[in-house]
């Protein structure tokens, strides 16, 4: 899909950010060659220093944006400590960007269990074997742990580790950006003071 084949109409007239995001993500799924749901996730440590990494968005609705991770990882620890995070999607083929930020909540056990069961068996084993974000002696040590958990769960279902679950960012700000000539880009931001509040929309200078 080219930039000339996108949703008709002026996106800056939209009044519903989740609907607009769904439209943009759908067009990215038709245009981006790899992982259109990839998103930069920013967190802050206890000293106020930011960290950012790519994760995969695994769901969204009017309640927020969901991804899954090891809660003992750097991002897991920082989110549990600060209870806030930010995301940035950039779809290069469409020359579009979406930024959002807000408080974070943990998904329900039922949600986490349901998603965990959809993962490839090797990925479920990996959730047990990987001590994410901690020093690793060698590749062999990781492969040994994978072999041990593969043997342990050779028969039957692989349970979800207690330290592996999902987070939901409940945005209080969502910004949509579209590239235009001469850096005179189109940019709108939806804001609300609380995740349960009504949205206000502001058009921003590029």
Swiss-Prot record:
InterPro entries: Pyridox_Oxase (IPR000659), Pyridox_Oxase_N (IPR011576), Pyridoxamine_oxidase_dimer_C (IPR019576), Split_barrel_FMN-bd (IPR012349)
Top-rank taxon, per record: Bacteria
GO MF annotation list: FMN binding; pyridoxamine phosphate oxidase activity
Source species of the chain: Rhizobium leguminosarum bv. trifolii (strain WSM2304)
Entry binding sites for FMN: 53-58, 68-69, 75, 97, 132-133, 177, 187
Record carries keyword Flavoprotein: yes
Cofactor note: Binds 1 FMN per subunit.
Pathway note: Cofactor metabolism; pyridoxal 5'-phosphate salvage; pyridoxal 5'-phosphate from pyridoxamine 5'-phosphate: step 1/1; Cofactor metabolism; pyridoxal 5'-phosphate salvage; pyridoxal 5'-phosphate from pyridoxine 5'-phosphate: step 1/1
Catalytic activity annotation: pyridoxamine 5'-phosphate + O2 + H2O = pyridoxal 5'-phosphate + H2O2 + NH4(+); pyridoxine 5'-phosphate + O2 = pyridoxal 5'-phosphate + H2O2
Keywords (A to Z) from UniProt: Flavoprotein, FMN, Oxidoreductase, Pyridoxine biosynthesis
Keyword rRNA processing: no
Subunit structure: Homodimer.
This protein's name: Pyridoxine/pyridoxamine 5'-phosphate oxidase
Alphabetized HAMAP family for the sequence: PdxH
Family affiliation: Belongs to the pyridoxamine 5'-phosphate oxidase family.
């Amino acid at each position: 899909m080219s930039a000339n084949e996108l949703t008709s109409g002026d996106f800056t007239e939209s009044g519903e950010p989740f609907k607009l995001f769904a439209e943009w993500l759908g067009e990215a799924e038709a245009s981006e060659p790899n992982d259109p749901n990839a998103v930069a996730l920013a967190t802050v440590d206890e000293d106020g220093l930011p960290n950012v990494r790519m994760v995969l968005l695994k769901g969204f609705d009017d309640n927020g944006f969901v991804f899954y991770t090891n809660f003992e990882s750097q991002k897991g620890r920082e989110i549990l400590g600060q209870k806030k995070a930010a995301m940035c999607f950039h779809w290069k083929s469409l020359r579009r960007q979406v930024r959002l930020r807000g408080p974070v909540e943990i998904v329900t056990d039922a949600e986490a269990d349901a998603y965990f069961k959809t993962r490839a068996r090797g990925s479920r084993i990996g959730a047990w074997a990987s001590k994410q974000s901690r020093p690793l002696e060698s590749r062999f040590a990781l492969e040994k742990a994978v072999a041990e958990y593969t043997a342990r769960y050779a028969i039957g279902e692989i349970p979800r580790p207690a330290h592996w679950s999902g987070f939901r960012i409940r945005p209080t700000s969502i910004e949509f950006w579209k590239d235009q000539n001469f850096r005179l880009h189109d940019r709108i931001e939806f804001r609300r003071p609380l995740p349960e509040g009504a949205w206000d929309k502001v058009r921003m200078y590029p």
